[in-house]
């Protein structure tokens, strides 16, 4: 196959490990209960090559996201390979990041470096590409290399190199349609600006999906400092905060249950969110802003979850990832999770603080 040969030569000629996303075509027969009528299956696939050009790993995507011409891996796959620099690499693709198998790579297969290819569709609050990428790396405590496609008209962008609890080492989130090469030294612990220096920081337009939060418990912040608590059933979200002045409309949101994904499946979730909201026709939180000028001197978001699969996101003005040395995330053995802005923290306006948990066992398909 010319494509695989070209990728193999690229890895060998440059003496690098190479992971690429391709479509894999496989014949099947009647003994396979999921075999299509044309006896051919197509898989969203990542392939990995060693420095000498050898194909060392192949992964078929487990969890499809509106990919009608693709087949999911059956049974679920775990693609892992070892490197000559001491890392054990685990592969997953895009939507997989929201499911248990991507974390089981770490828990059950001892992966020390995640590699993710992606065609992501941004959704606010919280579920936008680089926010999700960083959250996975923090939750699992290992580095992640994430490469995302640029399709501006679909709200698809965002790539990064993340170092677990240390946060991003280099990331890009710029709707400019340009390909970029991100480089980082995972062993470097010095504090550097992780944003790709060619990014457009204040774009004229973004394409974002705004989540319907009409079924969330919600409470607007009225004062510039104080404590707030909102509950959705037995699940409660607490906030303690101080700001010189609230220049933006912030709403505290809580949700326990299911969230609809593209009208074809529902994911089990628990969400605790502080976000800048826009009211439309009397609806408290219809749209989510990408701009904030409110600077908090204190911010602590806390919730007691029923699972330990909790993922944190803290975003500043224009959805920039708030520098990780400005905030911390902690989870106790009782699944009480806290996101805290450190003293003398961020100089930028805080846009969203999100703690979202996944209840994998509650997931279900609608059709």
Ranges and model annotations:
Residues 2-16, 24-112, 118-135, 155-156, ...:
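Active-site catalytic loop in hydrolytic enzyme cores
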Residues 149-367:
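C-terminal beta-strand edge segments of enzyme domains
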């Amino acid at each position: 196959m010319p494509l695989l040969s070209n990728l193999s030569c690229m890895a060998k000629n440059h003496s690098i490990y190479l992971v690429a996303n391709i479509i894999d075509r496989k014949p099947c027969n009647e003994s396979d209960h999921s075999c299509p009528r044309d006896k051919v299956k197509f898989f969203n696939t990542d392939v990995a090559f060693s420095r000498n050009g050898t194909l060392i790993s192949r992964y078929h995507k487990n969890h499809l996201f509106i990919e009608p011409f693709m087949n999911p891996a059956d049974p679920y796959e775990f693609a892992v390979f070892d490197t000559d620099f001491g890392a054990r690499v685990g592969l997953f693709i895009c939507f997989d990041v929201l499911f248990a198998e991507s974390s089981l790579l770490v828990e059950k297969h001892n992966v020390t470096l995640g590699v993710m290819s992606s065609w992501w569709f941004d959704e606010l609050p919280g579920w936008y590409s680089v926010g999700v990428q960083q959250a996975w790396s923090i939750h699992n405590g290992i580095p992640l290399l994430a490469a995302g496609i640029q399709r501006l008209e679909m709200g698809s962008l965002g790539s990064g190199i993340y170092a677990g609890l240390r946060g991003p080492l280099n990331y890009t989130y710029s709707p400019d349609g340009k390909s970029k090469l991100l480089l980082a030294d995972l062993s470097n612990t010095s504090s550097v600006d992780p944003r790709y220096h060619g990014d457009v920081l204040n774009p004229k337009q973004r394409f974002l999906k705004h989540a319907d939060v009409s079924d969330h418990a919600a409470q607007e912040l009225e004062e510039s400092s104080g404590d707030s608590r909102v509950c959705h059933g037995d699940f409660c979200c607490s906030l303690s905060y101080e700001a010189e002045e609230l220049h933006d409309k912030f709403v505290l949101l809580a949700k326990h249950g299911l969230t609809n994904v593209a009208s074809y499946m529902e994911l089990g979730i628990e969400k605790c969110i502080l976000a800048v909201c826009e009211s439309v026709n009397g609806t408290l939180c219809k749209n989510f802003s990408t701009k904030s000028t409110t600077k908090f001197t204190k911010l602590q978001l806390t919730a007691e979850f029923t699972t330990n699969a909790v993922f944190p996101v803290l975003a500043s003005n224009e959805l920039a990832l708030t520098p990780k040395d400005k905030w911390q995330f902690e989870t106790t053995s009782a699944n009480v999770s806290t996101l805290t802005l450190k003293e003398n923290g961020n100089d930028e306006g805080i846009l969203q603080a999100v703690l979202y948990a996944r209840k994998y066992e509650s997931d279900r398909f609608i059709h």
